[in-house]
Amino acid sequence: MAESTFMLEVVTPERILYRDEIQFMVAPGIEGELGIMKNHAPLVAALNIGVLRYQTSTGVDKRMAISGGFMEVIDNGTRVLAETAEHGSEIDVLRAKAAKERAEKRLEVRSEEINHARAKMALQRAIARIRASEKPL
């Protein structure tokens, strides 16, 4: 199995969140999802708020929520530099659902005092956290 794996490293400003061999990954690119496997062509891509999905070297499907950043694929390794990232198994789902509800309420209000772009991003982050916490199919 090792011959079909490559290194994934997920880094935030605070820490290295993940570093291990994986079989494949799907990242939320700005213009759609980006699938990466071993021997992928070199690539640098901007990432959107969303769910990063990957399969470990032992075949376990995992998810993490990321809130944008960049991804570099080079020499059979992938490095994700994320503004924030959180393992799906560590997400407080109740807190994420509450954040989603708050953002939706902010977006319903038509007021110059509400920063709608910021509320939309908060909603996207909450949805990504909820989706990352769900069990893979």
From Swiss-Prot:
The keyword Cell membrane applies. One of its GO terms (molecular function) is proton-transporting ATP synthase activity, rotational mechanism. Gene3D superfamilies: ATP synthase delta/epsilon subunit, C-terminal domain, F0F1 ATP synthase delta/epsilon subunit, N-terminal. InterPro entries: ATP_F1_dsu/esu_C_sf (IPR036794), ATP_synth_F1_dsu/esu (IPR001469), ATP_synth_F1_dsu/esu_N (IPR020546), ATP_synth_F1_esu_C (IPR020547), ATPsynth_dsu/esu_N (IPR036771). It is a peripheral membrane protein. Keywords: ATP synthesis, Cell membrane, CF(1), Hydrogen ion transport, Ion transport, Membrane, Transport. One of its GO terms (cellular component) is proton-transporting ATP synthase complex. It comes from the Bacteria. This is ATP synthase epsilon chain. It comes from Syntrophomonas wolfei subsp. wolfei (strain DSM 2245B / Goettingen). The lineage of its organism: Bacteria, Bacillati, Bacillota, Clostridia, Eubacteriales. The gene is atpC.
